[in-house]
A protein has these predicted regions:
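Residue-level recognition of tetratricopeptide repeat
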Residues: 5-7, 46, 82, 116, ...
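Register position in tetratricopeptide repeats
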Residues: 9-11, 50, 86, 120, ...
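Canonical positions in the second alpha-helix
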Residues: 25, 64, 99-100, 133-134, ...
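Structural marker of alpha-solenoid helical repeat scaffolds
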Residues: 28, 32, 67-69, 103, ...
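Helix-start (N-cap) detector for alpha-helical repeat units in TPR-like alpha-solenoids
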Residues: 33-34, 38, 72-75, 108-109, ...
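Terminal, low-structured helical/coil segments at or just beyond the last alpha-helical repeat
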Residues: 159-185
Length: 185
């Protein structure tokens, strides 16, 4: 592990070499994997995500979950959801973000993330429900208004889409103006 940390400090280091060293640190823990091994697994997850190795990162998230006996915070499920989403596992991502919501129902970002999964699944009515929950918690969440507008466009509700995009723009969303020009003219 210390060799991996030292390797990170070398200019122009190879991330693959760091992952290999972390693999060895985890292997050294053998069958007695514990909190120490869990820390190494978390480190390896971060590097795998940097290399867009989402499937491997998901496997490491699962290993980490097992190593610590499932004692995780809601943010764990959010982070694993992000990897699953990027890997194209939308059902797995949805289950994880819903676990995050269950653990922290007052976090608007989790509802927004749930909505974005529903949009990818073309479940626009479900997405709108999630968006409404996020906005109820954080009324100035501009990205949610943008997402509401996208759902309304897909549902052929042009007036509602314009209103949502306009609210997003008013709240400073950087993409809202472009979406208004693209979908509401």
């Amino acid at each position: 592990y210390l060799a991996a940390k030292a390797k990170e400090r070398v200019t122009g280091f190879n991330i693959g070499d760091v992952i290999d060293l972390l693999d060895k640190a985890i292997e050294k823990c053998g069958t007695n994997m514990n909190a120490e091994a869990a820390a190494y697994v978390l480190e390896r997850i971060n590097w795998r995500l940097r290399l867009a190795q989402y499937t491997e990162a998901i496997a490491d998230y699962d290993l980490y979950y097992t190593l610590i006996g499932g004692q995780v915070l809601p943010n764990f499920f959010f982070l694993r959801e992000q990897a699953k989403f990027r890997a194209g596992d939308l059902e797995g991502a949805l289950k994880d973000i819903q676990a995050a919501i269950q653990g922290s129902p007052s976090t608007p970002d989790y509802y927004a993330e749930e909505a974005s999964i529903y949009v990818r699944q073309q479940k626009y009515e479900d997405a709108l429900k999630s968006i409404e929950r996020a906005i109820a918690i954080a009324p100035d969440f501009g990205a949610c208004y943008r997402l509401r507008g996208v759902c309304c466009v897909r549902l052929k509700k042009k007036t509602e889409a314009f209103e949502a995009f306009n609210k997003a723009k008013e709240l400073g969303d950087p993409l809202a103006g472009k979406l208004i020009k693209e979908h509401c003219k």
